Curated annotation (Swiss-Prot):
The active site is at residue 40. PANTHER family: PEPTIDYL-TRNA HYDROLASE (PTHR17224:SF1). Its EC number is 3.1.1.29. One of its GO terms (biological process) is rescue of stalled ribosome. GO terms for cellular component: cytoplasm. Keywords: Cytoplasm, Hydrolase, RNA-binding, tRNA-binding. Transmembrane segments: none annotated. GO terms for molecular function: peptidyl-tRNA hydrolase activity; tRNA binding. Monomer. The record marks 30 as: Discriminates between blocked and unblocked aminoacyl-tRNA. This is Peptidyl-tRNA hydrolase. It comes from Bordetella parapertussis (strain 12822 / ATCC BAA-587 / NCTC 13253).
Length: 215
């Protein structure tokens, strides 16, 4: 994947704020080397690149049940989080951080893999259901609201990709080479619009990301 710093020239007045600025970015995945390259860790992949872009690094924070990185962007504090609770208990970590920093659900952006989108596609969404994604389900319960933002990174579904795997097995395996290349391209596209989301301009971020999906 290209090593590009997307945040270096962003000005505070570059975007028209239309929603609450994002103050907590959560990448979802499972901890440990056994899961590092699996589809379910797409949120971790993007979070790692955002930490690079924001010139910060993750460190273990046991009290928050996760890896935390702190940064400043456009004069505001931003926290990045990778829960180490395993996917199904992500809310334990997200809830702890949100309570500590007194953040509303609308100030939280969750990066996660999405079965209903093909590799190479990505969508932004606020609120709604969890569509069977156990990480989102647990976060919704922990925050007491579905109104957090989601950045849905397409990994495809076994059926849409012509595979016989069960979903539970599919998400815990690495993407095929072509799929990985498509996901990497999407991650670069996401990195380019995260500054807009940090400023609260989800209209711009949505227009840029959805317009490039090609389907």
């Amino acid at each position: 994947m290209r090593r590009v710093l997307y945040f270096t020239n962003t000005r505070p007045d570059a975007y028209a704020t239309m929603s609450d600025p994002i103050r907590l970015i959560v990448g979802l995945g499972n901890p440990g080397p056994d899961y590092e390259t699996t589809r379910h860790n797409a949120g971790f992949w993007l979070a790692d690149h955002l930490a690079d872009d924001l010139r910060t690094a993750f460190a273990l924070e046991k009290g928050f049940f996760g890896m935390l990185a702190k940064a400043r962007h456009a004069g505001e504090n931003v926290v990045l989080l990778k829960p180490i609770t395993y996917m199904n208990r992500s809310g334990q970590s997200v809830g702890a951080v949100a309570r500590f920093y007194k953040l509303a659900p609308e100030q939280v952006l969750v990066l996660h893999d999405e079965l209903d989108l093909l590799p190479g596609q990505v969508k932004i969404k606020q609120g709604g259901g969890h569509a069977g994604h156990n990480g989102l389900k647990d976060i919704q319960a922990a925050l007491g609201s579905p109104n957090f933002w989601r950045l849905r990174i397409g990994i495809g579904h076994p059926r849409s990709l012509g595979l016989a795997q069960q979903v539970a097995d599919f998400v815990l395996h690495p993407p095929r080479r072509e799929e990985q290349q498509q996901i990497d391209t999407v991650i670069d596209r996401c990195r380019a619009v995260v500054p807009a989301m940090l400023a609260g301009d989800f209209a711009l971020a949505t227009r840029e990301l959805h317009g490039a999906n090609g389907a």
